[in-house]
């Protein structure tokens, strides 16, 4: 209250408190004691002012004597910090013309001077009388003078003049008045300075502020917000001008939340039951419905029990509650699909943002236990956040009981500690058509036909009667498609055009009808050139067959000769170093044998024999896509005469190469040119007759397999991953049958095209591993560099590379694929990897890896290389898995193979993490950081309470990412329960 009174006083006295007096002769009750010189000049007398008050004055009237120079000096005046001083003089002057017999030296003016000093330097005995030390302020002239008549009638014509001077810097000053022939009285002298008064403006207090040294000066005064007020935007300030007046303020203060303005000078606390949420609000408001403020100065009203306010609700909005459950559910079952419809909740909680979630549970026949539905179930328009009271659910299992919970939620459901209200409905699906075929593989192709195979649907839902194949040229559309049927999961499509790309789909049929067509996949028939090339490759087989007939006849003759002799002798057969083909004895066509290009005396001959020379004019280079050992790798186009233009990858040989580097570079083309398989990267040709030298291969849109998997973590099904592995194994089977050992089989050396077909590549590196000194993947061993993490132990120890060592590497590739590109053996050093393998430790199964696949990995990692499966056996095993997807349902665990010690990648110590950011970084899910924080999961304690529905709600939709995060949350929860202090 006292402060309020003070503020009111400051406002009321603002105008009156603008001048501070330093000296005023009107208040003197004794002699002023000023110094006059000469003594006959100025004289101090007592008199009366116009109001007949007694005053002390000085007068002088020596007008009858010429050459007057009368000085009057005040006492020392302390300036009290003022920079500019004002002097108010009240005086009377006799009109010279009213004086008889006055000489011409009579004056009606006088001069005002000042002298600035730090101390008293002039007294009556030691005064200085010269204009030199003084600074003249002005010559003072009377506006009115009086005559004898006025004097006789006692009419006092008093003049008042104000003069200012400055700036002053010393402690004080003297005033001096000079008379040089006037008849006058100095009635009073008031010396003062101006200042801007204390004031309250815009809820801020500004202190008294002296004016500046000049009349035009502006002095800044910083304001202080009154109690319970805060500055808004810029700091608040006022300018004090030379007249002691405040200028327009800059900035302002306003009452802070919980306080309202009172009389524009105070901020009063909001009473109980009211609130003020922001500085900008004018006054306190009553609490909205279902909320209260039990104490004063509340910035917000808290919700009553059972009511909540959403994060995005403003404070002035009423608190609301959660909705009741949906009503009157209707279900319509159609084979393995269902339509659910319902009525909105009877109580919406006072909100208009009610949405619905569908929780799907698949149950046993007796419904005693249920589990969440898998990710294959489809919801239209969606599973979570439905705005309409209707949903279509498909891809359910046939003849299976289901329970569906329909939850009603609104903007405050997440604030409630209780689960959302819901209504449940139990249904059982009927017989249904089979699910889709997951993938197709090309077995072979001719100019006029393509042979395909595929696994049966994951959910056959009965006995498969047959398959229907739909196909059409890619350049056309499905309205121009043709149909074919097959009783098995293999079909040969005839009557096709050479060199054309065909789009193919397949679907299965049961007694319930056809299932949906599979996804579209592209396959290509052979061109005329491809056919001729294949024919050339089979000529040795034809010649060999003819030779075999001759040999047979000769053999009969030889047998008769041998039988007629008592002894026979044998001699060693000589074989040509350049034997390229032989009949395998397994039927047509015969298998080619790989020829090492370095067995040629002239390696260029190998290039000419195995690689087709391409004119550089047929090649268009477009953009850099990488860098190889010998130069840059480009994406480009190849347009050969009579063929359509295709995308290609172009490896170039950098300038300044040596002849050895050129041979080494082209050796990869000599190797690649010998291979022809859908899962081996295809060589289009080489450019050697111009610069730069180029190796041209087919273009693989998705790049290296390891980085492709990391970019698509969790986005592929197990069947799709097994299909990729099957393609890699088929390519390696082909290489092993050609007696070619890859030596560097790894996911980084597998390329993926747009149809997810995986192809083995990088054939130049296997011979030159010892030349790579920069890549930490490769470690020195026996004078060379080998990729330790992918290499069989016998190859590390003795550099014994065989197809069996490639099988070991293939097992590592399997682990890379099933872990979506994780680094084998994680952050273990290469030496630690070698030691662990020598002690018979093997990699554990990746997360959610089927047990059958991990067992195949362990088979590939047998210490005895003769115990490892051959690539042909691996292909057969994977084909069985694809044909029987149920075999992939069992997930492997570390304890599943007690006879085989497995490396255990230790679970991170989650108790060491302090923030959600640290935890997400540790599990490599940092891309969801903003989603967690925005949704309010800002602490690890909150994270441990998350469910799969929470992950869906914040945007984690990939199944693999959900499983990875939920697994980590479970481990964190276990660790925190073991360390209760962490939960504090």
Swiss-Prot record:
Q: This protein is called what?
A: Ephrin type-B receptor 1
The record's tissue-specificity note reads: Expressed in neural stem and progenitor cells in the dentate gyrus. Expressed in myogenic progenitor cells.
Gene designation per UniProt = Ephb1
User: Where is this chain's protein located in or outside the cell?
Assistant: Cell membrane; Early endosome membrane; Cell projection, Dendrite
The protein's matches in SMART domains, at most eight in alphabetical order, are given as: EPH_lbd, Ephrin_rec_like, FN3, SAM, TyrKc
The organism's superkingdom is given as Eukaryota
State the organism of origin.
Answer: Mus musculus
| Transmembrane spans | 541-563
**Subunit-structure text:** Heterotetramer upon binding of the ligand. The heterotetramer is composed of an ephrin dimer and a receptor dimer. Oligomerization is probably required to induce biological responses. Interacts with EPHB6; transphosphorylates EPHB6 to form an active signaling complex. Interacts with PICK1. Interacts (through Tyr-594) with NCK1 (via SH2 domain); activates the JUN cascade to regulate cell adhesion. The ligand-activated form interacts (through Tyr-928) with GRB7 and GRB10 (via SH2 domains). The ligand-activated form interacts (residues within the catalytic domain) with GRB2 (via SH2 domain).
Query: What start and end residues bound the annotated signal peptide?
Result: 1-17
Domain (Protein kinase): residue spans on this chain: 619-882
Annotated keywords = ATP-binding, Cell adhesion, Cell membrane, Cell projection, Endosome, Glycoprotein, Kinase, Membrane, Neurogenesis, Nucleotide-binding, Phosphoprotein, Receptor, Repeat, Signal, Transferase, Transmembrane, Transmembrane helix, Tyrosine-protein kinase, Ubl conjugation
Residue positions of motif PDZ-binding: 982-984
The record places domain Eph LBD at 19-201
């Amino acid at each position: 209250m006292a402060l309020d009174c003070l503020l009111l006083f400051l406002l009321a006295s603002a105008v009156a408190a603008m001048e501070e007096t330093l000296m005023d002769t009107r208040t003197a009750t004794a002699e002023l004691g000023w110094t006059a010189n000469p003594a006959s000049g100025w004289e101090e007398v007592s008199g009366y002012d116009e109001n007949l008050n007694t005053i002390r004055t000085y007068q002088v009237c020596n007008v009858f004597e010429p050459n007057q120079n009368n000085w009057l000096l005040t006492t020392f005046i302390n300036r009290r910090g003022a920079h500019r001083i004002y002097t108010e003089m009240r005086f009377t002057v006799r009109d010279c013309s009213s004086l008889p017999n006055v000489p011409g030296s009579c004056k009606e003016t006088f001069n005002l001077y000042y002298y600035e000093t730090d101390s008293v330097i002039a007294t009556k005995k030691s005064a200085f009388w010269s204009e030199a030390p003084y600074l003249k302020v002005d010559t003072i002239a009377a506006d009115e003078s009086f005559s004898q008549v006025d004097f006789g009638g006692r009419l006092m014509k008093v003049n008042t003049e104000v003069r200012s001077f400055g700036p002053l810097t010393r402690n004080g000053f003297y005033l001096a008045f000079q008379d040089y022939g006037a008849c006058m009285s100095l009635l009073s002298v008031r010396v003062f300075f101006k200042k801007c008064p204390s004031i309250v403006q815009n809820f801020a207090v500004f202190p008294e502020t002296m004016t500046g040294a000049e009349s035009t000066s502006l002095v800044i005064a910083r304001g202080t917000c009154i109690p319970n007020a805060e500055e808004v935007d810029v700091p608040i300030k006022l300018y004090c001008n030379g007249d002691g007046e405040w200028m327009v303020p800059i900035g302002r203060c306003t009452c802070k939340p919980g306080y309202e303005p009172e009389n524009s000078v105070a901020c009063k606390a909001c009473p109980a039951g009211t609130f003020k949420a922001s500085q900008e609000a004018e006054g306190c408001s009553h609490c909205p419905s279902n909320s209260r403020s039990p104490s004063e100065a509340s910035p917000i009203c808290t919700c009553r029990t059972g009511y909540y306010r959403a994060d995005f609700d403003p404070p002035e909005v009423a608190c609301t509650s959660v909705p009741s459950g949906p009503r009157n559910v209707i279900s319509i079952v159609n084979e393995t699909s269902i339509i659910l419809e319902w009525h909105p909740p009877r109580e919406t909680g006072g909100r208009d943002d009610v949405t619905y979630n569908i929780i799907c549970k698949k149950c046993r026949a007796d419904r005693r236990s249920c589990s969440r539905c898998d990710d294959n179930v489809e919801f239209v328009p969606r599973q979570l956040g439905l705005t309409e009271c209707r949903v279509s659910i498909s891809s359910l299992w046939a003849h299976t009981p289901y329970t569906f919970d329909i939850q009603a939620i609104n903007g405050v459901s997440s604030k409630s500690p209780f689960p959302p209200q819901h209504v449940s409905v139990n249904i059982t699906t009927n017989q249904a058509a089979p699910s889709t075929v997951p993938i197709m593989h090309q077995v072979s192709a001719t100019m006029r036909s393509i042979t395909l195979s595929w696994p049966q649907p994951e959910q056959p839902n009965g006995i498969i009667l047959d398959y229907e194949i739909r196909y059409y040229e890619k350049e056309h559309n499905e309205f121009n498609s043709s149909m074919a049927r097959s009783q098995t999961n293999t079909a040969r499509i005839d009557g096709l055009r050479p060199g054309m790309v065909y789009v193919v789909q397949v679907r299965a049929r049961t007694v319930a009808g056809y299932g949906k067509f599979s996804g579209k996949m592209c396959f290509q028939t052979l061109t005329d050139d491809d056919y001729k090339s294949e024919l050339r490759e089979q000529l040795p087989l034809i010649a060999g067959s003819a030779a075999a007939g001759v040999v047979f006849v000769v053999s009969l003759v030889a047998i008769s000769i041998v039988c007629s002799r008592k002894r026979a002798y044998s001699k060693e057969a000589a074989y040509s170093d350049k034997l390229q083909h032989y009949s395998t004895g397994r039927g047509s066509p015969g298998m080619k044998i790989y020829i090492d290009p370095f067995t040629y005396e002239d390696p260029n001959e190998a290039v000419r024999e195995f690689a087709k020379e391409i004119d550089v004019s047929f090649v268009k280079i477009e953009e850099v896509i990488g860098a190889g050992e010998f130069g840059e790798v480009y994406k480009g186009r190849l347009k050969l005469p009579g063929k359509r233009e295709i995308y290609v990858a172009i490896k170039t040989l950098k300038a300044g190469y040596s002849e050895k580097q050129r041979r080494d570079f082209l050796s990869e083309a000599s190797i690649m040119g010998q291979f022809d398989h859908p899962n081996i990267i295809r060589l289009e040709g080489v450019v050697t007759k111009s610069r730069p030298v180029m190796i041209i291969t087919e273009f693989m849109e998705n790049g290296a397999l390891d980085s492709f998997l990391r970019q698509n973590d969790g986005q592929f099904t197990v069947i799709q991953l097994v299909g990729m592995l099957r393609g890699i194994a088929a390519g390696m089977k082909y290489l092993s049958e050609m007696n070619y050992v890859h030596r560097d089989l790894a996911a980084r050396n597998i390329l993926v095209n747009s149809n997810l077909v995986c192809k083995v590549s990088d054939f130049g590196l296997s011979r030159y591993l010892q030349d790579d000194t920069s890549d930490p993947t490769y470690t020195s061993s026996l004078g060379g560099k080998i990729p330790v993490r992918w290499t069989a132990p016998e190859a590390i120890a003795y550099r014994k590379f065989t197809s069996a060592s490639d099988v070991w590497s293939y097992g590592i590739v399997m682990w890379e694929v099933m872990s979506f590109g994780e680094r084998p053996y994680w952050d273990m050093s290469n030496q630690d990897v070698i030691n662990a393998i020598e002690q018979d430790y093997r990699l554990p199964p990746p997360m959610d890896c089927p047990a059958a696949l991990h067992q195949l990995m362990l088979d590939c990692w047998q210490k005895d290389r003769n115990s490892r499966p051959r690539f042909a056996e691996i292909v057969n095993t994977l084909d069985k898995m694809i044909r029987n997807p149920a075999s992939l349902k069992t997930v492997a665990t570390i304890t599943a193979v007690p006879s085989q010690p497995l490396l255990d990648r230790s679970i991170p110590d989650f108790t060491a993490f302090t923030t959600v950011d640290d935890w997400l970084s540790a599990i490599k899910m940092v891309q969801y950081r903003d989603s967690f924080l925005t949704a309010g999961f800002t602490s690890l304690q909150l994270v441990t309470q998350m469910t799969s529905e929470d992950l869906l709600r914040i945007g984690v939709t990939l199944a693999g990412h959900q499983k990875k995060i939920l697994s980590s949350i479970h481990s964190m929860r276990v660790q925190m329960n073991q360390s209760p202090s962490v939960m504090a």
